[in-house]
Design a protein with these regions (language model features):
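Short hydrophobic/aromatic beta-strand element in the GNAT-like acyltransferase core
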Residues: 60, 137-138
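Acyl-donor-binding surface of acyltransferase catalytic domains
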Residues: 26-102
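A short beta-loop-alpha structural element at the N-terminal edge
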Residues: 27-28, 94-119, 129
């Protein structure tokens, strides 16, 4: 969901993960907060992941006034390929598509990589810790 365009939708994936009626919204602005809340009420949503631009303090504060809590912030890095080219591939690390036989090893890497990770799911005290951990390894 891009942050430039307002979108809201039910989130069956999060509902399955946590057994809570869930939705996701992106591109949230102060003007869209009432519409977003109406959507949640209409659909019985009690767990909403809402994203707004970090520079849009008005949107964040409007959500806080409605009882929302800030769980995390995200930073996206970009690189202009016009200003500097991608470095040449030195073939030091082989890259290939994952095979079905790799499944257990990939899960093991994910489990180790996200051990003690604290994401926005973990920041919500209503959510069971083991289910939060499973989000990053499933």
């Amino acid at each position: 969901m891009p942050l430039d365009i307002y979108q809201i939708a039910l989130s069956p994936l999060d509902e399955d993960r946590f057994d809570i009626p869930s939705a996701r919204a992106s591109g949230v602005t102060i003007e869209r907060v009432p519409e977003m809340i109406a959507f949640c009420r209409e659909h019985g949503v009690t767990f909403l992941i809402a994203r707004s631009r970090a520079t849009d303090l008005n949107a964040a504060q409007a959500m806080e006034r409605q009882g929302f809590l800030l769980m995390d912030t995200l930073v996206y890095w970009t690189r202009s390929l016009r200003e500097s080219a991608i470095p040449p591939d030195t073939n030091d690390v082989p890259v290939r598509l994952m095979r079905s036989a790799d499944g257990e090893q990939v899960i093991a890497v994910a489990v180790e990589s996200f051990r003690d990770y604290f994401g926005h799911y973990h920041a919500d005290e209503r959510l069971e810790r083991t289910r939060c951990d499973a989000v990053y390894t499933s």
